[in-house]
C-alpha cells in the first residue's frame, strides 16, 4: 500500500478524518461528446430528485467509503475535489468490494464529469487501470478483462482473467489497440491482492493529455489522447471542454437494471474505499 505520509514531492488530498477538500455530487448523464445532441430522460420531480442524490460518502477507519444511497437503489454519485489540477501524478490506495464499478475521473468539470476515467471496474468482465471517456466520446482503452473465481458456496475467493469468448465481452481488439502500452493480464494477476488494499497511480500530462497507470508498481496502460482515432472523438474539442486543469472525482456507478450486468455492476450494499491520496503537480 501507499506510505502513511506523502512521498517526497507529493502532498495529501485527504486527511483520513473528514471530507475536507471534497464535495459529493450527483452522477448525472452528460452529452456523449462535445456538441452531441442531448436530452434529459428524466423531468420534473424525478430530475430534481436525481440532482439531489449525491450518494453515500463516509470516512471510516481512515478511508473514504463510497456507496449507493440508498444501498441497492442503483443510483450512483461522485466525490469531487475542490481543487483543480493540470499535469500531475496521483497515487492512492483502493479497496473495492467485489462487484463494484468504480474508478476516478481526471480533468473533470465541477460536477464530476465529463472527464477521463481511470477504471476500477472490480466486477465480471471488468478491468483495473484502463480508461473510459465520460462525455469524451466514450473512448475506451482496456488492456485486459477480469472476473472472480468462487468457492462452492458462491463466495468470491480470487481474481482470474475473464473468458475472452463469452457473449458479453467488453474487451476487444479495439479497446486494447488504442493503448500505446497494455499490460498482460497474467502479470496483473500476480500483483493484485484480492480483498486487500491495492495502490493505483496515474500520470496525467499535456494539454491533450497522455495518461499512464500503474497498479502496485506494475505499469498497466498508456493512452495518448493526441494519437487515437475513435468515433466522434475530436481531440481539440475535448481538450477545450476539459480545460487545461480540472477536478478529480471518485465514482460510484449507477446500475441500469435492464443492462446485462444488472446487479453485477454494483452489488446491493457494496462499497469502494480510498485512502492515502497523494498528488504531485508537474506544471
Feature map (PLM): residue ranges:
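Carbohydrate-interacting regions of secretory-pathway proteins
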Residues: 1-283
